[in-house]
Amino acid sequence: VRARLAPLLLLAACVTTPPPMAGGIHINEPDLDAWSAALQGAGLDTVQVTAYARQAAWDGGEVGFERQDPSEVIVQLEAAQRAGLRVMLVLRTYLEHALPENRHLWHGRIHPRDDQLDAWFANYREYALWGARLAAEYDVDVFVVGNELNSMTSTVFPDEAIDPHEYFLDAERTAKVRDDLVGCADDVVARGDGSDLTHWDGGRFDSLHDQLVDAERARRAWATAVTGAGSRAEIQARLEARGARLDAGWRALIDDVRGVYRGPVTYGANFDQFHRVGFWDALDAVGVTSYFPLTLWGATDEEQRAAMTASWTEVADRLTASATLDEDDVLPVYLLELGWTRLEGSTVRPWSYDRVDVLETVGEVEEGAAQPLTCVHWASQPARPDERVEALAALADLVDSGGFDALRGFSLWKLTTRDYHHEGERFAVLVPADVRDNTPNDSDTALLAQAARLGALLRQSAQRKRRTSRR
């Protein structure tokens, strides 16, 4: 159990309590005032606004935000203010994929070399202070100082939690996954359903096998650079030493941000990495992108509902554990990206929706054995948007029962007032608006109703806590 640092105790009077927030992220809305009105009409109260920085080489110290036009952020902040909506400003970083050395990696793998780490923090500090000044000027309700920087924010390493490094270094394990995927793709093509299974990686590779081999090479090189590829004990020691530097860097940066912006500050950890962030006590809330697996492939409707309840309960317990600083100090939790596609099976691996995958499947499993797998071709999958409605309803039910008292807010990924976004963005949820191209559908309306219900529950919970704290 961690205790808050003394400097943060001194700042407590300056930082407002993280508010309940129920909202989402839009998809290139052309009319922000109409978008804000639509959001309010759906019973939601928060807009998530994003700013972007660019990371050059994954192992370098160059972080730049010169391509981020401040006016693009400001116009969204002003529209939300006009509508009386709450605002969460999120700093995101994208990895420059035009650089060959970054191929097959993502921003969660950003990991500057030891001799570049100080430069990285100096550059990222400028980005964070730029965002903090905007947050202060526009009275943003919550400022998210970074998002999904897995390798840069893993500062604690339980003995059993060295993955993904071990996985990338294990040629036998990566080959097994590769063979499963290639076999799945071959089966799809053999039955005549694989028109989308060509032009791998923009045509750079002739086959999925070649693409996956190249990806394994890149990720193994990344893991070798990060860990030194020594023994487990050597890797553990190396990661812990690096983690100490990262922890100090983030705490100093957060202190600097607080000198500019006096509202609540959090960070957006990935759903599979939040437990490795060791500096939650320096922040005002735990933030997480919420793509947690909730079900298994092939479950009946009854099995699926039971699995959703059990999975959300486990997620709530784990997040609450990370948010617990001491017996009387539990940080609020925000689900910064909460969403599923409209396809059947979207709650098995919410991040998976393209080409082919092999998904964990319902079945009898002996102790110690792996869950059976099923080949899934996403382009052949039928739509089942009610599945995501049920997933959100299960979360709302858990909150209603008192099973996730730490939850303070969520942002749906992604909302739109334009029905044509349904074709290009599988996560899209259509928000009814007074525009001619709007065609509300029952499943999106039902999902928004559950979102509004969850938002109301979170506001009621926050009110109860305020009354209790005044006694």
Regions found by a protein language model. Name each.
Residues 8-16:
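Hydrophobic h-region of N-terminal signal peptides that target proteins for export
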Residues 18-23, 43-45, 81-87, 139-141, ...:
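Short, well-ordered coil/turn segments that N-cap beta-strands
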Residues 27-41, 121-134, 270-277, 389-399:
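Short, acidic/polar
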Residues 70, 75-76, 90, 227-255, ...:
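Glycoside hydrolase catalytic-domain groove-lining segments
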Residues 15-44, 50:
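Boundary/entry segment of secreted carbohydrate-active catalytic domains
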Residues 42-60, 72-214, 220-227, 231, ...:
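Substrate-binding cleft and catalytic face of glycoside hydrolase catalytic domains
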Residues 24-26, 57-70, 109-125, 149, ...:
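The substrate-binding groove and active-site-proximal loops of carbohydrate-active enzymes
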Residues 162-199, 204-206, 351-352, 377-393, ...:
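Aromatic-rich peripheral "rim/lid" segments of glycoside hydrolase catalytic domains that contact
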